[in-house]
């Protein structure tokens, strides 16, 4: 049986030109990435490669330093263009360059006759500005080269890859998106790091990071300054109790074991200062009556505790407990504190499984207990949220 041999595949001229253009674009992008990334990871071989620095120019030639050397080349010359070296040997001097600056140089500081380049490099004070301008020129050329390639290299990545002088400040972003990125930096940081330290203002991406910061930074400083008595870390009382009971996770165990001072009759002696602002009244700037915990004696201003008007009046009618001593008002235990639900009108705590009927998940918005619903009626936070 005869076998049919297919003829060679004929490609159109347009297809061939497009393939050549794609090949040229890929090679140009590959060379640009190899010169910018240190090292460059070759996707075809999986080998990390570095720039070889073997390509030199005539202007990079310097005088020989060792016996028998005619030329020497500087290291990594592609990062910064060197000025023309003045060769002392007349046989090696280019005929097109006639520089008459040797005599003034010798008169000024008694520079050596041999390698003039080393003497010029010693005068760093007069050449720093020129070198900075040369570096900026190289950076501009490389960035302009990248704009011609159809790829998505970020301008910020380019700035990180191009080396800078050790004591030089970070340059401004170049390109069309540079201004927009600087303007959106604050909003991106607020969105990526929503957890803020209320003492120093440092931001974190998650709550465990903020908890670690509180425990190992501010708590350690406080324990080093005041070994006799320990103050509680500040916490924010929020109307959203679902977020509020999650804050119990970052309270240190050492702070839970705070021993209260008791009077001879057995009653707890409350602190005479606010544990959060230490008496400064930073929230309002006005004097306020302190609210003290019935179990540990810690005190705080209503504004520092972020209490509402109804909550401030309600906590004085019963034995109020701070966040570290809080227990369920129905069963009287502080176990399973992650299940505690706090009333937004009186700050009493209730286990969700102790309520009638029990709750599987905390409700959205404000929540009022049965006592506040009976006493405040339409003025309760739960009714205000619904309306």
From Swiss-Prot:
Record flagged with keyword Zinc-finger: yes
Cellular localization per UniProt: Cytoplasm; Nucleus
Zinc-finger ranges (C2H2-type): 195-218
SUPFAM superfamilies on file: beta-beta-alpha zinc fingers, FYVE/PHD zinc finger
Residues where Zn(2+) 4 binds: 325, 343, 346, 369, 372
InterPro entries from the UniProt entry: DPF1-3_N, Znf_C2H2_sf, Znf_C2H2_type, Znf_FYVE_PHD, Znf_PHD, Znf_PHD-finger, Znf_RING/FYVE/PHD
MF-aspect GO terms: sequence-specific double-stranded DNA binding; zinc ion binding
Stretches annotated zinc finger (PHD-type): 271-328, 325-375
Keyword field: Cytoplasm, Isopeptide bond, Metal-binding, Neurogenesis, Nucleus, Repeat, Transcription, Transcription regulation, Ubl conjugation, Zinc, Zinc-finger
Residues the entry annotates as binding Zn(2+) 1: 274, 277, 301, 304
Keyword Transferase: no
PROSITE patterns per the UniProt record, alphabetical: ZF_PHD_1, ZF_PHD_2, ZINC_FINGER_C2H2_1, ZINC_FINGER_C2H2_2
Signal sequence coordinates: none
GO CC, any one term: nBAF complex
Residues engaged in binding Zn(2+) 3: 328, 331, 351, 354
Superkingdom to which the source organism belongs: Eukaryota
Principal cellular location given in the protein's record: cytoplasm
Residues the record lists as binding Zn(2+) 2: 293, 296, 322
Biological-process GO terms, alphabetical: apoptotic process; chromatin remodeling; nervous system development; positive regulation of cell differentiation; positive regulation of double-strand break repair; regulation of G0 to G1 transition; regulation of G1/S transition of mitotic cell cycle; regulation of mitotic metaphase/anaphase transition
Covalent crosslink: Glycyl lysine isopeptide (Lys-Gly) (interchain with G-Cter in SUMO2): 106, 129, 133
Record function comment: May have an important role in developing neurons by participating in regulation of cell survival, possibly as a neurospecific transcription factor. Belongs to the neuron-specific chromatin remodeling complex (nBAF complex). During neural development a switch from a stem/progenitor to a postmitotic chromatin remodeling mechanism occurs as neurons exit the cell cycle and become committed to their adult state. The transition from proliferating neural stem/progenitor cells to postmitotic neurons requires a switch in subunit composition of the npBAF and nBAF complexes.
Complexes and interactors: Component of neuron-specific chromatin remodeling complex (nBAF complex) composed of at least, ARID1A/BAF250A or ARID1B/BAF250B, SMARCD1/BAF60A, SMARCD3/BAF60C, SMARCA2/BRM/BAF190B, SMARCA4/BRG1/BAF190A, SMARCB1/BAF47, SMARCC1/BAF155, SMARCE1/BAF57, SMARCC2/BAF170, DPF1/BAF45B, DPF3/BAF45C, ACTL6B/BAF53B and actin.
Family statement drawn from the similarity comment of this UniProt entry: Belongs to the requiem/DPF family.
Protein name: Zinc finger protein neuro-d4
Organism: Homo sapiens
